[in-house]
Swiss-Prot record:
Keywords: Antiport, Cell membrane, Ion transport, Membrane, Transmembrane, Transmembrane helix, Transport
Cellular localisation: Cell membrane
InterPro entries associated with the record: CPA3_Na-H_Antiporter_D (IPR050586), NADH_UbQ_OxRdtase (IPR003918), ND/Mrp_TM (IPR001750)
A GO molecular-function descriptor: NADH dehydrogenase (ubiquinone) activity
Membrane-spanning parts: 3-23, 33-53, 79-99, 109-129, 131-151, 162-182, 210-230, 241-261, 272-292, 309-329, 331-351, 370-390, 404-424, 452-472
Protein name as it appears in the record: Putative antiporter subunit mnhD2
One CC-aspect GO term: plasma membrane
Quaternary structure note: May form a heterooligomeric complex that consists of seven subunits: mnhA2, mnhB2, mnhC2, mnhD2, mnhE2, mnhF2 and mnhG2.
Entries under NCBIfam families matching the protein: PRK12663.1 (NF009306)
Record function comment: Expression of the mnh2 operon in E.coli is not able to catalyze Na(+)Li(+)/H(+) antiport. It does however confer higher growth rates than the control strain at up to pH 9.5. The operon may encode an NADH-ubiquinone oxidoreductase.
Encoding gene per record: mnhD2
Protein family per UniProt: Belongs to the CPA3 antiporters (TC 2.A.63) subunit D family.
Keyword hit for DNA repair: no
Membrane topology per record: Multi-pass membrane protein
Lineage: Bacteria, Bacillati, Bacillota, Bacilli, Bacillales
Length: 499
């Protein structure tokens, strides 16, 4: 019972900290230590819960003494807790990275509070086992992210915010419509209860329509085909906010797609999974076009996010254990790698004052850390062993082969090479670039930011080396979410499909 109560802490601690920070906007030092300490503790608690779940069984927390399906339930299983742990870790580093960026101005806008409110929505989305509360968490994320995009009040930010909000509101409307139709059909909102009742119903046209509604809603959140909001939104954000959005916002949508189309709507595999694979292929191609079409390194980074979403959903679309396992592994890896990517890109813009790669003017010779970090990051994105992207991509390849999706497999290989090429092009100018012989006065990057970059580089290498440990977690997550009977037995054994 006591252990179950700990499940609320990864969401509760950032929420309480965000409220306290509102009243500490004039005290930078206390604010910094408070939010960094809060997210560090949140990461440690999440990791402890993950270790327990791996050694024993999933944890559930029923609020108010009301057991599922009637009450609100949080679920700590391998999938939710590895996502919470990874998200908490990168949020901690992102907030530490922004430590020295005009704190007085940031606190005047309550920037740390809104980052923490966004964290509440992200972590709550991973932990909830209830459909309506997932919607609530998505709306918390949407509200906080809208405020973060518009901070600074420039024309570019407001334009990007309008596109971002309109598309995400449409996604939210579809999500709410799907919830209403699903509740009318099955009479419950709890994940495990929904899974049981949908299995009892078998193939059903109404359920098929509902599953398609959820597919579109989550695709808008994940930037799966419906990516129009992403490049403009990410391009106007400062470094830490761009890293935050790239690491987490699309990943919550991808997580929802994985949870829904393995656990809930698995009886519609013949329709949904080929559609997912097709959408993934389109997304990869669009992302690949984007990374070679621009010289703006922030936009190149944004399209790298789109390509990676295509990789993840291709794994899900294979509808094989290997493919789904690879999708989850790559999802976790991509949170860390995209944080590193946007930290590096943001640092390059800060040092040179330019966003076009041809102005990098041999920067890596003067700042060798960025050259080394960039090379490691490229290999991780490309799936080169022994770096962190390799195990996930191998499993997705394996799943595509088992599924017979040779077109998706070929596109993944081609777009991976294009993604690496676009980054090697930046790297070339970092080492050898010379824009018309001009001298660029490089700014000095603060030492603490170099240390944070170094931490992320070490983690990227460690994930690749310790891949068997991570794969144990992702394999358990895959097994639980692809087996309705196992999920019911371990999560809500008291529920019956006909109740």
């Amino acid at each position: 019972m006591m252990l179950s109560n700990l499940l609320i802490l990864p969401m509760l601690l950032p929420f309480l900290c965000a409220l306290i920070l509102v009243f500490l906007k004039n005290n930078d030092r206390i604010s910094k230590y408070l939010y960094l300490g809060t997210m560090t503790i949140t990461t440690i608690i999440s990791l402890m819960l993950l270790i327990y779940v791996q050694r024993h069984r999933p944890i559930t927390l029923d609020f108010g003494g009301w057991s599922a399906p009637f009450g609100i339930q949080f679920l700590g299983d391998s999938l939710s807790l590895i996502m919470v742990t990874t998200a908490s870790f990168v949020i901690t580093l992102i907030m530490a990275y922004g430590f020295g960026r005009g704190e007085h101005k940031a606190n005047r806008y309550h920037l740390p509070s809104f980052i923490l409110f966004l964290s509440v929505g992200v972590i709550g989305s991973f932990l909830t086992s209830d459909l309506f509360n997932l919607y609530v968490m998505f709306e918390i994320m949407l509200l906080a992210s809208f405020v973060l995009i518009t901070l600074g009040q420039s024309v570019e930010q407001l334009r990007a915010a309008i596109i971002y909000v309109v598309l995400n509101i449409i996604g939210s409307w579809l999500f709410l419509l799907g919830i209403g139709l699903l509740y009318k059909t099955v009479g419950t909102l709890n994940f495990s209860h929904i899974a049981m009742r949908l299995n009892d119903m078998g193939d059903n046209r109404t359920v098929t329509m509902i599953s398609l509604i959820f597919l579109v809603a989550f695709s808008a959140k994940a930037a799966l085909v419906l990516f129009m909001w992403l490049p403009k939104a990410y391009a106007v954000l400062n470094t830490e906010l761009a890293a935050l959005f790239a690491a987490l916002m699309t990943k919550v949508g991808a997580y929802a797609l994985i949870r829904f189309f393995t656990l809930l709507f698995d009886q519609h595999n013949d329709l949904i999974h080929p559609l997912l694979a097709t959408m993934a292929a389109i997304t990869m191609v669009i992302g690949a076009i984007g990374v070679i079409a621009y010289k703006d390194i922030k936009k190149i980074a944004a399209y790298q996010v789109i390509i990676s979403i295509g990789f993840i959903i291709l794994g899900l679309g294979t509808n094989t254990f290997a493919g789904i396992n690879g999708a989850i592994f790559y999802l976790v890896n991509d949170i860390v790698v995209k944080t590193l990517l946007f930290f590096i890109i943001g640092s390059l813009v800060y040092i040179t004052g330019y966003r076009q790669y041809q102005y990098l003017n041999g920067l890596a010779k003067k700042e060798p850390l960025f050259g080394v970090a960039f090379i490691i990051m490229i290999f991780a994105i490309g799936g080169v062993p022994p770096f962190s992207g390799f195990p996930g991509k191998v499993l997705i390849f394996q799943g595509a082969l088992q599924n017979g999706n040779y077109i998706g497999l070929a596109l993944m290989i081609i777009t991976s090479l294009i993604a690496m090429y676009s980054l090697f092009r930046i790297l070339f100018y970092m080492y050898f670039g010379d824009k018309d012989g001009e001298e660029v006065n490089f700014k000095k990057i603060p030492l603490y930011r170099k240390r944070i970059l170094s931490i992320l580089v070490v983690v990227v290498i460690a994930i690749g080396i310790a891949a068997p440990v991570v794969l144990n977690v992702t394999s358990d997550a895959t097994e639980l979410n692809t087996s309705d009977q196992l999920y019911q037995k371990l999560v809500n054994p008291h529920l019956k499909g006909e109740d």
